[in-house]
Amino acid sequence: MAAAGGGWAAACEKFRSARTLSAVESRKDPETEPYRSKYSARALLQEVKQQLSAAEDCGEARLLAVRRAVLEYELGVNHTDTEELSAGEEHLQRCTQLLEPHRLSRDCVSLYIQAQNNLGILWSERDEIKTAQTYLESAEALYNQYMKEDGNPPLDPSEHFMAEEEKLTDQERSKRFEKAYTHTLYYLAQVYQHLEMIEKAAQYCHTTLKRQLEYCGYYPVEWALNAATLSQYYLSKQCFMESRHCLAAASVIFSQAGQVPSTEDNETEQDQQDLRQRKAEIARCWIKYCLNLLQSARKLLEDNIGELDPDRQLELKAQRKKEEDEKENGRKKAVLFGTSDICDSVLAMEEKVSSVYPLDFQEAREIFLVGQNYVQEAKEFFQVDGYVTDHIEIVQDHSALFKVLAFFEEDYERRCKMHKRRIDMLEPIYADLNPQYYLLISRQLQFELADTYYEMMDLKVAIGNRLEELDSHTIKKINSLAQLAIKYYELFLDSLRNPDKVFPEELEEDVLRPAMVAKFHIARLYGKLITSDSKKQLENMQTSLEYYTFLVDYCEKHPDAVRAVETELELSKEMVGLLPTRMERLRAKLCPFI
């Protein structure tokens, strides 16, 4: 067939036209005929296939087999694109069968890997993930074997239908081959994620992202979102340096997205909306980063009553000073993204926020402020009107940032003001929320508001204890905060009642601990209310006893619940033993002659 120059040139032209129809013209197909160009491409490929069949007796068996394999591959992808998976599978299988004896040769290896990639995708779409894994791992192994045994840039499949003078340079061949292998790793990352092999999925995702930058084969928005998602994996492993690096790279690469002109002007408005949403999603990942770093530092620094341990703080500061010199070496071992110019931008981005545990208020505040900036950025897109759940989650994260910052603040008054900021942001959104439609979020807000008022009350009591005598203003404030905490805890507990307002005999596992903690805190809050009226004091003690008793009785009836509230149960048992005696003493004072 090579000798029949005119016929071969025509076949090459048809092949090129088919690829153009599939890759370019198909984008312009009307909605009524979404696959018009794909079907036209298929017809051309079938014509070329017939021409090859007619030339089978020309003696160039190996060459013809490879060219037929290219056509089977193109037809396989074409049928898959038009959702004809069975036909697509047949063509792709024929492709690999034709190439099997020569799969490690320079003219076949790239095509064989791409066919296996597409078989992997095809089986993934059928939800046969294990089968997909087999094909993709086979493609990965073949790439590694070829690079070890040969390593020269192999032919691109399209070159089998090109004149000699049109053939690609080695540089272009290498780029296309590496891109095919990057796709293998990308699909493997998804397969491992699906199979819940999370660590392996993260490793493959990181390698894919790195290679996409190296070979300039990526869409900025998609790349940035994948990097931001990967950052959350590293966050779950407490690998803050790696998490920050992924997020910094995501922000830098995302900034390129606005510089890429839209291919279709009529989609520009939607494109801009999508860009704003993606930017807000990356901002939310940054919020989680700052919040997790602060919360992890708190766990390291807190004592057994949840306060900052000064000895532990000094110990960690000394340890960190010792490790400063090793920091640079560790940095170089981290997997870095991109070429030198991208690396410079990423490193500049990283310098805006620490990746080491903050050990005092000033360090914590710097991380808090970065997180707060991203809260504002995320809220610009995720507004209450249209994104209720997302908006509330962002506000909850903002509240959590204030909560953890308050831990580092030594001054009780200033700490109280931080909790007041939380109240000011949470109460308005709770007031506007319909619990009928947003029951879970409503419960979360009730509990958080109750907890915040509870914490403020504790702080006001601690401030009052420093005074020689409690003044009426402080007493009023303590009582007001306690009553507001009780109000929100009761609202939370009421939300657990059935339509007949009856509290459940047995609590669901997801609400067991919050409900028990709410009961325990209400018991304690009634004990904290300050009154000069002994009768009222007795009533409060009685209510307090009832709530403590509920917790003790519930755990006796449901022993499985004990693990969830061990500390609270121990203290409740103690109070159930002490309170009746105290109440008797108080009654004796009220009625001395009885």
From Swiss-Prot:
What are the UniProt keywords, alphabetically? Cytoplasm, Cytoskeleton, Developmental protein, Differentiation, Neurogenesis
* Localization (cell): Cytoplasm, Cytoskeleton
Q: Name one GO molecular function term.
A: kinesin binding
SUPFAM superfamilies linked to this entry: TPR-like
| Alphabetical list of Pfam families matching this protein | KBP_C (PF12309)
GO cellular component, alphabetical, reads: cytoskeleton; mitochondrion
InterPro entries, per database record = KBP, TPR-like_helical_dom_sf
The record's Gene Ontology biological-process terms are: central nervous system projection neuron axonogenesis; microtubule cytoskeleton organization; mitochondrion transport along microtubule; neuron projection maintenance
| Keyword Cytoplasm recorded | yes
Please state the protein's primary subcellular location: cytoplasm
Q: PANTHER family attached here?
A: KIF-BINDING PROTEIN, KIF1-BINDING PROTEIN
In which family does this protein belong, per the annotation?
Belongs to the KIF-binding protein family.
Please describe what this protein does: Activator of KIF1B plus-end-directed microtubule motor activity. Required for organization of axonal microtubules, and axonal outgrowth and maintenance during peripheral and central nervous system development.
Q: Indicate what this protein is called per its UniProt record.
A: KIF-binding protein
